[in-house]
């Protein structure tokens, strides 16, 4: 083989290799390692079609490092996340009493017993708990009066108030109460009001064990605007209706008033599960889950100008794409059980007769676990199938459905078939956090399909 032909072949080979990706980068030599590193990074940036910058969240997650914010940018930790919606604050820990209500009524629903038949529910379908926001008055020793403050602004005047109770955990006394001077009473009043709401008589001779004291405060909540509720606990010796003037007139032999702290009602050194709890029982009209989502949107808008920012949850209600029932943008999207079956409704299976089919609902996949405490998932079922002639009696067709099915059997092109829809629905209990960070139990109607029919 002569030399010109060899040179020509080498030129064609080099031209071919030069067009291959990465050959130029590999063939460029550098006199120093720093120049080579910079050239490599520059080539990678040009290939990606962007300038060098801090890694994205997804890239940082793969590298196991948190992305470092630039000085001119707001720190990422201060931006709202999907798991912590704007305006909600830290995660709310439900009180054990509310969890017990949910467990009790959920079991009753499985047994076919409506929660409104329970005496403790007071025929209510909504039970809201409010945590005490007051502080001990340390300037008074002994503590003869103690105020409890509750923000009840989330209650609606459209709801019927059927009951309210104040639950106070009385710790075991650390010291004897002293010589008895008659019966020992703890009384509950509205702040700045002489109206006695409820009272309890304690035995000064014995040492009562720790436990909950429940006071009926329905009258106090019924006669005031639903914004702030202030209740005052007092302790006194003697008869239940004895006033302060009568107690002072008894002379120096009257023992000092009992200290509420020594009675076990002090707030200091108290875990969250032992804090005072206001429980309100209401009966509201039929309310669906989308109404709750609108309240979540309203609370986010009220949180501040950044509450409705792009990528936050919930989105602003005025936005054209505001669909709060969809998963939040920051969440990992998954195919739900319903979505995975959506493509199987054609062909042979679509000709099955109308019947109840499984539909597993996962609130976490919907992005609702930010405000729903329990249940995080349940079996809702759905109706699927055809309503063809002749209609089966167990489908309980209406007269209109029968006529429509007959017309469809004679001329399918002119009349559509009747639809397979739920004919009986049952409720489920949901424990959730409202827009005011209060834990609420509510019985939602029409959540589970019990039977299907043609309509």
Swiss-Prot record:
Composition skew (Low complexity), residue ranges: 77-91
InterPro entries linked to this entry: Cystine-knot_cytokine, TGF-b_C, TGF-b_propeptide, TGF-beta-rel, TGFb_CS
Main location: secreted
Effect of residue 444 to N: In SYNS4; increases chondrogenic activity; increases SMAD1/5/8 signaling pathway activation; not inhibited by NOG
Domain of life: Eukaryota
SMART domains: TGFB
Keywords: Apoptosis, Chromosomal rearrangement, Cleavage on pair of basic residues, Cytokine, Deafness, Developmental protein, Disease variant, Disulfide bond, Dwarfism, Glycoprotein, Growth factor, Leber congenital amaurosis, Microphthalmia, Non-syndromic deafness, Secreted, Signal
Residues bearing carbohydrate: 114
PANTHER family membership: GROWTH_DIFFERENTIATION FACTOR 6, TGF-BETA FAMILY
Family listed: Belongs to the TGF-beta family.
Stated name of the protein: Growth/differentiation factor 6
Organism: Homo sapiens (Human)
